[in-house]
Amino acid sequence: MTTPRAQEATAASAYPRRFRRAEERGRRIGRILRRVAGVRHVDEELLDRIGRRMYARDEPGAALVRAMRRDGRPGAERVTMAQFERALREGVQAVPDAPPELVRFFSLVDAVPAWVDFDLVERGAGVIRRLGRTASDVLLQLSLIGGYRFGGPAELLVATGGLSGATAMRRLGETETWSNAVARPGGLRRDGEGFRLTVHVRVMHALVNDRFEHNGRWDVHEWGLPVNQSDLAGTLGLFNSTLLLGARALGWWVSAADARAVMHLWKYVGLLLGVDEDWLFDTEREQNVFNYHVLLAQDGQTPAGADLTEAILKGQRRLSEARSNRLRAAYARARLLGMLRCFLGRQSLEELRIPVTLPWAVPPVLVRNLAASLLLGRTEHGRQLLERAGERFRDRRGALLFAGARPRVGPLPL
């Protein structure tokens, strides 16, 4: 079902105005990615699909949300939050007289495709757990802040109230809580926290999309749908192949078999999130080719991205100063700014209003990661040590991001 505003926008143009508006900038940012992925020619058909799917949503999620809205729907058809939460915890069969849309939605997310190999999922989860702080570094600096370089998703984050330092850090904590749950042993089994939080995030996306499609605060002609298939698939790419690319850039050795396992884990997560199945990839190369074309499809830098970056950096500084002496806090900031310089480059830092510094704190990180992955990572005992170290780091980080409260993902904004 397409809303009148989305129909009107699609009738006016096959693509929103932001599509390919800063293509040369995308080429510059994606130079290394293009070489890594072996892209020789731009796939115009793929770019066309990316542009068109800026007007496409997660339809099963949207149908569930329509049934959750208080719009005079008969009681037997309307889905309550209590019914959704019980179905998520216990299965839809545990909901008495479950409404049809609730049954349809959970029949999709509960169905495990034949291609899902849970042994491979568990191997991928172990790789992510061993990455520990390196995974957090990459997801914050390359995936999150790197994603603020483009208009569209950044505007939605600002519109939903992400500009205060406290809110920015809470959202970062919620994202890390979810990604950590996905990587726990058994996390993506039906009774795992990673499964439950992923489905929760999917419905949260659908609720936000529904709200901003209808409240008159979102320019569909400019940006496409608030939460659309192209942005969803692009975001998924920040958690799989971008994580691997960034970890290697920081000195972490990842074998081809381990990389395939990480890709497989996130392929299943993408399915649960409602990403179109033809954009769920098995290999790094396929994902990197897609990611490169996503870069070409993007808009340029907008004020929203720089404002979000400022909020994150202020929040990170407050965390460092609260838990460390002045010298350690200064090192933490130098480490963060140095990695951002390496990942994003001077020009992107200037566009995001990030101080440009010499990355002197990065070489020790490279040495440490090389030693950890090449020495400890080669034995079972060493891998167990890395997993435990990663778990301790995640516990400390969660306590900081949530100021001592229990880490969690935000409630559904019904």
Predicted features and spans:
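Mature, function-bearing regions of proteins
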Residues: M1-L236, N240-L414
